[in-house]
Amino acid sequence: MRNYEWVNVFRFIFFIFFALSVSLISITAVDAAGSKEADTHDHGHSSHHGIDGAKLPLWTIIPFAGILLSIAVFPLVAEHFWHQNYGKVSLAWIVIFSIPFLIGYRGDAWYEIVHIVLLDYVPFIVLLSALFTAAGGICLKGSLRGSPAVNTIIIAIGTSLASWMGTTGAAMLLIRPLLRANAWRKHKVHVVVFFIFLVANIGGSLTPLGDPPLFLGFLKGVEFFWTLKLFPVMLPVSILLLIVFFVFDTLMFKKEGAAPDDGEKQPLKLDGALNFVFIACIIGAILFSKSLADGAFKDETVAEKMAPKIQKAEGEMAAAKDKLSAYVSSNSGASLDQSNAEYYQLRTDHLHAVAAVNGLRAKKTHDENLGVDIFGVRVPYANLVRDGLMILIGIVSLIYTPMYRTVKDDHGHVVPEENAAETNLRAANGFTWEPILEVAKLFIGIFICMIPALKILQAGVDGKLSNVVLAVQSSTNDPINTMYFWLTGILSSFLDNAPTYVVFFNTAGGDPTSLMGPMSQTLLAISCGAVFMGANTYIGNAPNFMVKAIAEENGVKMPSFFGYMAWSIPILVPVFILVTLLYF
């Protein structure tokens, strides 16, 4: 099918989805209007504003499924159309979702969209852009031949660095040298795939700097170095995958012809090394903003005011748990499912009590963070300082290692001017803005369209995905760590892994002291699931997509969305099953 024909097909699909969305969301909103309790819901799902996920029907996640399917299918069936129009496709799904959503839920819908853009998407893309810019100004020059040993060493170094400079920083630093080292090889897709597995995901397990889910845990009170407890899991997983990679790369290497003669061997050297300092400054900005949030930009009176309410709610939560446990222990022969009304009521009472405590904790965090209200959303001053510093650092990096002049080639691609690589470090490094632009355009659609899925999950036992919440709990609502690991991981593969982590963190009680203490295995399961299984898909973690885009820029024919999963499932799932048997 020609490009213009695909445009017409897409327009038809767009209008069909738009019409259906307007009708269905409007009907649902009218249905819910009579019993709207979003601001005063006594289960604590909504701490201040926004939509109660318990009232959202499951079909509202269709636009989210639509944008994921677009990412998966269009590159397969309409590759040229996709590369020319992926930003428009993302925008189309935003419109399909947002306009009916706003018509149906009005102010609450507006709040949710602005909230996820200002507090999730903007920090997300600012951090990625800053790391992308700084790392793109570091160029490893010299003779580097992509043998199995060299490739394994590069991936191992990246895996080690990822926890300390972030998965994005480590991936952006090393992907270009790795691609240049293997440019002469025909069989190199697997090199990039394993790089995504290890450097862009699993390597970021050991500190809150490594991956966004762990940083959110840090913001919720998990100690900075607690995440080192993931080391006994991360190390054997990394070693096992490196061994598998080395064996596979050795087999592929034997299929290659003789390596080309590059002439006189050049010693390795790093240009633009000052950008390492800029990357360190980005990490420093993150930690500095946390100290500001805990100090100068914190209203200390809020904790004192909220303490009695939180203590009362925690007492009610403990009492509800005791009642549930007592019933289960004294009714061992009873059916412990929804068919037993008394049992199910006790179980949901406890889960509602947990949600109420989490709601009060969220309200406390919201109220004590001093900030500026933008369209009704409180943006903490600490966030503004952090993002402002990172933007400034990115600008300084561009001043130190400036961009080159570009031209368009015969295919419309932006490329460096002729001979630019000889005089410009970023040109020599193959640096372009296209990978970060692709992530920015696609992920704004993903973030906005996933609002219903996140709200339904946050609604817990009252939401249409209540079975997910119940699946991680035993009959007495004690955690089932195996299920926490797998469900956090599976959802993190398709949703943003940071809010998914928070959903299950709160489902497990949301108390960092308890989760670092007697429930440490549960927190370990949630953390491993969120970080490790981000490697399952291209959208599981943002660096995955950026690495894919850079590889394609360098002539590597990367697998499609489903093609990538054809690698990740047979390689990673057996490893995760082994992790389950050994640790959870």
Predicted regions and their residues:
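Juxtamembrane and boundary regions of transmembrane helices in multi-pass small-molecule transporters
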Residues: 187, 206, 216, 225-270, ...
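Flexible interhelical linker loops that connect adjacent transmembrane helices
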Residues: 249-274, 412-413, 420-433
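Alpha-helical transmembrane segments
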Residues: 116-128, 226-244, 373-392, 484-487, ...
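Transmembrane helical segments that form the transport core of multi-pass membrane transport proteins
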Residues: 279-503
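Hydrophobic mid-bilayer segments of alpha-helices in multi-pass membrane transport proteins
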Residues: 60-71, 85-100, 121-130, 271-281, ...
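Cytoplasmic-side transmembrane-helix entry/capping segments in multi-pass membrane proteins
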Residues: 83-94, 118, 122, 144-156, ...
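Transmembrane alpha-helix boundary signature
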Residues: 29-33, 79-80, 98-120, 132-147, ...
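Membrane-interfacial helix-loop connectors
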Residues: 100-101, 162, 173-187, 191-193, ...
